[in-house]
A protein has these predicted regions:
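Active-site rim/loop-helix segments in enzyme catalytic domains that contact anionic ligands
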Residues: 1-111
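Metal-dependent de-N-acetylase/amidase catalytic core
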Residues: 1-14, 94-238
């Protein structure tokens, strides 16, 4: 399948993911392209990732992972990062999560909303986890909720009906792609900013973020003519 170029007819984007590091496995390369082009991108994290490091208690891991996420965002030109403080590892799909995300959509007023893979499986067939699935499905619904003045009245301000695109990265079957070759070093820097988390994984594959990201970006680029390195998205017109 040949991937299509990611649409460029938008000015403001909101990235909504479950955990610190979720966007950095490739998606942040696209963010670097967008901020270099002068687009406004902000991040919303549903949790602080406090349950993500087995050797560090949540009370310590939360602030540590928040700091790493802010550094990862700075590497790709993003200054505005918010956290909702839903509990890591047990994120529940439901009205509270939809309300919280819809409120930020109304306040930030994005035309593009980006989230992570919320399908049941990752590319290659590995099972996804509940936090990712619940967050992505809540993001999908919150894009609609934000535009309905009778849903969550008063949350976040006036209704916002101009979300034009929802995009998910890390998906099994992408439809669109962004050429990240010119900003690949910034994509690597954003993933490398999660030093404590990557070290705790104890995974030789993740010991070298550049090699890991390059292999995935080369695979996507095989479906995206003209690019040597690319990140894929499934695009859902709203």
């Amino acid at each position: 399948m040949t991937l299509q170029p990611f649409p460029d007819d938008w000015s403001r984007a909101l990235v909504v993911v479950a955990h610190p590091d979720d966007m950095e496995y490739g998606g942040s390369g696209a963010v670097a392209c967008w901020t270099e082009a002068g687009k406004e991108v902000t991040y919303l994290l549903v949790t602080r990732g406090e349950a993500g490091i087995d050797t560090i208690p949540p009370v310590e891991a939360g602030p540590l992972r928040e700091a790493e996420q802010r550094a990862a965002c700075a590497a790709v030109g993003v200054a505005e990062v918010e956290f909702l403080d839903h509990p890591d590892g047990v994120v529940e799909y439901g009205l509270p999560l939809r309300r919280d995300i819809a409120a930020v959509i109304r306040r930030r007023r994005p035309e593009l909303v980006v989230t992570g893979n919320f399908a049941d499986r990752w590319p290659g067939g590995w099972l996804n986890m509940a936090d990712h699935v619940h967050t992505g499905r809540a993001v999908l619904d919150a894009c609609r909720d934000a535009g309905n003045r009778w849903v969550f009245p008063g949350a976040g301000g006036d209704p916002w009906t101009d979300v034009r695109y929802l995009a998910a990265t890390g998906v099994p079957e992408p439809t669109h792609a962004v050429d990240i070759g010119p900003v690949f070093d910034r994509a690597v820097a954003s993933l490398s900013a999660h030093r404590a988390y990557l070290a705790a994984l104890g995974d030789d594959v993740m010991a070298d973020p550049a090699t890991y990201l390059r292999s995935h970006a080369e695979a996507v680029a095989q479906q995206f003519p003209g690019a040597d390195l690319a990140v894929g998205f499934e695009l859902f017109p709203m």
